[in-house]
C-alpha cells in the first residue's frame, strides 16, 4: 500500500470513528450513565492504555512546569471543555445536528486568528462564516422548544475546539510526543469532569456490563484510532486533504442518528448540513 492510499484510509477511518461518538455516548447513557459521566470515562479509561503504550515504547513521562501549565489551560478551556459541551448537547438536539454545528470550528478558528492574532482574512473566508451561520439558522424550527439550548451548547463546543486548535499550534505544545500530550490532556480533563460530576451529583458507577464495555472501547479507540489516524493522514496526504476527508465525521453522525435512533432529518436540516460542510471544504482547500 502506497503512502497516499494509507493516508486517505487512516483519515477516513478516523473521521468515521469520530462520527460514531454520539452512538458511544448514547449507549453509555442508556446503560445507566449520563453525558457528564460518559465524558469522564472517555478520558479516564484511556489513561492505563496510553500509559502502557508510552512505557512500552520507552517514551519519558516527564514534562516541564511550563508545558504542564499550558496543557492544563488548553484542556480546561479547549480539549476537555469541548467534550463536556458537545456531549451535553445530545440531551437537547439530534446528535447529527450537534456534530454538524460543532464542525463549524474551522470557521471559528479563522475568526480567532483574525481577531486575536491579527491574521488577514480573505473575502472567501468571510463567505464561509456566512455559510455556517446560515446553516445554523436553517437548523432552527419553532416546534423544537428545547433546541436552542442544544444548539448553543454545540455552538460553544465549536468555539472551544477552535481555541484548542489555535492554542495548540501557537503554544509550542506540538513539540511534545503526540500520545504523551494526549495522556496529560486526558488526565486533566478526567480530573476536571470528575469534580463537575460529583458537585452536580451526576457521577455514577452504576453502569450495565454493556455500558462499561462501550466506555472502555470508546476511551481507548478515541485516542488510539481517532487521534492517531488523523495525525497519520496529515503526515501522508497533508493537512488540506485530511481536513476535506474529515467531513466524513458529521456525515457519519447524521447517518447513525437517522438509522439507529430514528432522528428526524428534514429538508431544512439537509440544507443546513450542506451549508456548513460547504464552508468546511472551502476552508480546507484554501492555500493561505
Question: What is each residue range found by the language model?
Answer:
Residues 30-81, 108-109, 160-167, 182-201, ...:
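Transmembrane alpha-helices of multi-pass small-molecule transport proteins
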Residues 1-37, 41, 143-170, 191:
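Glycine-/small-residue-enriched transmembrane alpha-helix faces in small-molecule transporters
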Residues 15, 41, 98-104, 168-190, ...:
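Helix-helix packing/entry segments at the starts of transmembrane helices
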Residues 112, 121-141, 193, 247, ...:
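Hydrophobic transmembrane alpha-helices of multi-pass small-molecule transport proteins
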Residues 23-35, 59, 91, 137-149, ...:
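Membrane-interface helix termini and inter-helical loops of multi-pass transporters
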Residues 28, 38, 42, 89, ...:
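Hydrophobic/aromatic residues within transmembrane alpha-helices
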Residues 17, 22, 51-96, 102, ...:
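Specific transmembrane alpha-helical segments of multi-pass solute transporters/efflux pumps
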Amino acid at each position: 500500500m502506497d503512502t497516499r492510499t494509507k493516508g486517505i484510509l487512516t483519515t477516513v477511518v478516523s473521521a468515521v470513528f469520530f462520527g460514531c461518538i454520539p452512538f458511544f455516548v448514547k449507549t453509555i447513557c442508556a446503560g445507566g450513565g449520563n453525558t457528564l459521566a460518559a465524558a469522564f470515562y472517555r478520558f479516564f479509561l484511556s489513561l492505563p492504555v496510553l500509559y502502557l503504550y508510552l512505557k512500552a515504547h520507552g517514551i519519558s513521562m516527564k514534562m516541564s512546569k511550563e508545558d504542564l501549565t499550558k496543557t492544563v489551560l488548553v484542556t480546561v478551556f479547549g480539549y476537555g471543555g469541548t467534550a463536556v459541551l458537545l456531549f451535553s448537547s445530545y440531551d437537547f438536539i439530534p446528535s447529527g445536528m450537534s456534530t454538524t454545528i460543532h464542525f463549524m470550528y474551522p470557521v471559528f478558528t479563522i475568526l480567532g486568528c483574525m481577531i486575536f492574532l491579527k491574521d488577514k482574512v480573505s473575502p472567501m473566508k468571510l463567505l464561509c462564516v456566512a455559510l455556517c451561520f446560515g446553516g445554523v439558522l436553517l437548523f432552527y424550527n419553532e416546534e423544537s422548544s428545547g433546541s436552542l439550548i442544544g444548539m448553543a451548547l454545540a455552538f460553544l463546543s465549536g468555539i472551544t475546539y477552535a481555541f484548542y486548535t489555535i492554542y495548540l499550534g501557537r503554544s509550542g505544545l506540538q513539540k511534545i510526543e503526540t500520545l504523551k500530550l494526549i495522556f496529560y490532556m486526558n488526565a486533566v480533563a478526567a480530573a476536571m469532569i470528575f469534580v463537575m460530576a460529583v458537585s452536580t451529583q451526576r457521577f455514577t458507577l452504576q453502569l450495565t456490563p454493556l455500558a462499561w464495555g462501550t466506555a472502555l472501547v470508546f476511551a481507548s479507540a478515541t485516542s488510539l484510532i481517532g487521534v492517531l489516524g488523523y495525525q497519520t493522514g496529515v503526515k501522508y496526504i497533508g493537512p488540506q486533504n485530511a481536513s476535506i476527508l474529515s467531513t466524513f465525521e458529521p456525515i457519519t453522525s447524521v447517518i447513525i442518528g437517522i438509522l439507529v435512533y430514528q432522528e428526524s432529518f428534514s429538508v431544512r436540516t439537509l440544507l443546513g448540513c450542506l451549508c456548513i460542510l460547504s464552508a468546511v471544504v472551502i476552508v480546507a482547500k484554501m492555500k493561505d
